[in-house]
């Protein structure tokens, strides 16, 4: 090598250091973007195996009676409005189902944090006992306050307390295939939504209302006992509080004291300061309100426009049956092709559009239209329910999922508490014009849900409101970032 080649070139080191610095900064930015894409954790997931699939089976069996009955709300509302509560107005009866939906969804918060710290068994036992007590007592209900206590509080709260751990155990065992796994577990509720209306319709005629409810209680008992035995968490993913913290102290005390302590800290206020979580929660509130109110009133709508009783029953059955198939297919597409948030956004927008272009103008033109609408709505609706916890998990650590998911559904419960009576008030005495107004309300709320999920996705990928370093206001840049984030797979 020549002496000139051995000499150090002036400025070369400085340029190399500058280039290395730029490269390092670019790498850091890429790392930050990856961190924004998915909430990182240090856990390993089975993605299958005996324990994981038994947990899925346990969740499936638990959802069959608890959420299967939730999907049957329209059948129950229509039946008691014509028999036990025939002299009571629609808006008054709607309070029963408003309390029921509020207790079911709001009581997630009672078990979410407890599951994160201690696992599934105790909240499952507590929730199942409450559910079965209310179910057996329903057979003796004759007054509105009877239904509020037994159906609204006991059945509703029992279902909600059991639901958070049933979803949580799925997230403990699956990450990459979480959408499909959640769909398989929650399809228990969809299948229950097919079986229970048919079962009740037959038993109402043959055995009468009291024994119909008791028979459903006996059937539910077998499913729920198996659920407690099979739905097990992964102990490695239980949240471990810091030494000396309130959670640590309460977890080492008695069950009653620990439950009260967990209850006081179970609502995750800090999470609501995250825009991605806040908009995800708002999207879930709007989506659940729209679909829950639709299930509650679609049966009475069918009877108002003159369709036969069996049509009202079977439309709900078709809706729930198609939710099984649609829920699995859309969850598979979410995991493999499009991303969980993208599918959730499309589903909610389509639910609103179908309401505007199909149910509103043509719902009263023939029962065949409502069967077709029920099939389309069910195919979309099933995947919406399956992906709600998956989207929450997409922006949450797995050891904090129970608390964040239950906080989200506590707010959904409050939305139901106001939304169902509002829907009942819009319907009023039940004229076709009033039902058309409530269809507009349902559809608009679904579209709003899609918009909120879109905003959540944008903030999860990159904050579109982040200011430019050199400008105080950068509206074109903000709009560009928003559009860019909205088009990405997530």
Where in the sequence are the language-model features?
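Conserved MFS/SLC helix-loop-helix module at the cytosolic interface between two early adjacent transmembrane helices
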Residues: 106-146
């Amino acid at each position: 090598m020549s002496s000139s080649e051995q000499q150090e070139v002036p400025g070369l080191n400085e340029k190399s250091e500058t280039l290395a610095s730029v490269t390092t900064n670019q790498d850091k930015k890429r790392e930050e973007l990856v961190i924004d894409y998915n909430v990182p954790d240090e856990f390993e997931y089975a993605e299958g195996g005996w324990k994981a699939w038994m947990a899925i089976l346990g969740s499936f069996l638990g959802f069959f009676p608890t959420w299967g009955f939730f999907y049957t709300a329209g059948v129950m509302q229509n039946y008691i409005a014509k028999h036990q509560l025939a002299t009571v107005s629609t808006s008054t009866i709607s309070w029963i189902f408003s309390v029921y939906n509020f207790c079911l969804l709001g009581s997630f918060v009672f078990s979410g944090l407890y599951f994160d710290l201690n696992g599934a068994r105790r909240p499952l036992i507590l929730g199942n006992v409450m559910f079965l007590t209310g179910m057996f007592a329903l057979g003796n209900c004759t007054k509105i306050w009877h239904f509020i206590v037994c159906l609204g509080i006991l059945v509703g709260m029992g279902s909600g307390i059991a639901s958070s751990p049933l979803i949580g155990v799925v997230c403990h065992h699956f990450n990459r295939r979480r959408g499909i796994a959640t769909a398989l577990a929650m399809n228990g509720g969809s299948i229950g939504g097919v079986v229970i209306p048919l079962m009740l319709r037959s038993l109402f005629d043959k055995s009468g209302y009291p024994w119909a409810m008791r028979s459903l209680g006996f059937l539910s008992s077998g499913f729920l006992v198996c659920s407690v035995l099979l739905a097990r968490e992964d102990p490695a993913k239980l949240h471990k509080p810091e030494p000396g913290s309130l959670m640590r102290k309460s977890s080492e005390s008695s069950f009653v004291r620990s439950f009260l302590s967990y209850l006081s800290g179970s609502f995750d206020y800090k999470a609501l300061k995250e825009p991605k979580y806040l908009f995800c929660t708002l999207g879930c509130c709007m989506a659940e309100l729209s679909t829950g109110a639709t299930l509650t009133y679609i049966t009475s709508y069918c009877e108002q426009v003159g369709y036969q009783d069996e049509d009202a029953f079977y439309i709900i059955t078709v809706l729930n049956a198609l939710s099984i198939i649609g829920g699995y297919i859309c969850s598979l597409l979410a995991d493999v092709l499009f991303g969980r948030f993208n599918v959730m956004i499309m589903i909610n927008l389509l639910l609103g559009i179908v309401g505007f272009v199909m149910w509103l103008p043509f719902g009263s033109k023939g029962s065949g239209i409502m069967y077709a609408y029920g099939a389309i709505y069910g195919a979309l609706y099933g995947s919406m329910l399956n992906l709600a916890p998956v989207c929450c998990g997409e922006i949450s650590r797995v050891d904090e999922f129970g608390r964040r998911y239950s906080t989200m559904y506590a707010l959904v419960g409050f939305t139901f508490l106001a939304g169902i009576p509002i829907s009942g008030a819009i319907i009023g005495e039940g004229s076709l014009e009033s039902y058309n107004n409530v269809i507009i309300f349902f559809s608009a709320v679904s579209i709003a849900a899609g918009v909120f999920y879109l905003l959540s996705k944008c903030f999860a990928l990159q904050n579109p409101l982040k200011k430019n370093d050199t400008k105080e206001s950068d509206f074109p840049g903000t709009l560009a970032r928003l559009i860019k984030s909205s088009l990405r797979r997530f």
